[in-house]
């Protein structure tokens, strides 16, 4: 497997401390700027491996299945780690949740019609 792209995103739940909502918004932020045409050109979208890393203050509060379901193609692996940020909102209570997200897409390039060039 070779890594073909790594996209980064940030997601925020401004009210309510919903860690899954923040994670899903981070995934959307990461992937909405990409069009991985190589997977479609060679009809390999279902063969890509997608690794997702979500960083939030309370990893146990993220629904891994919902995160995996947010990716439209590939075999999805989700890792949730401690990170991100919880902060006080305008009302002075800690209710803002920020998730940092990395989405990496991989493809097995052996016996493939295109070749990656080492530089």
Predicted regions and their residues:
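Flexible, glycine/charged-enriched surface loops at secondary-structure junctions
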Residues: 34-47
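Long, hydrophobic N-terminal alpha-helical segment
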Residues: 1-33
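Mid-chain, well-packed structural core segment of small domains
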Residues: 49-92
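Conserved active-site and cofactor/substrate-binding residues in soluble primary-metabolism enzymes
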Residues: 18-26, 62, 66, 98
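A generic structural motif
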Residues: 10-14, 58, 109
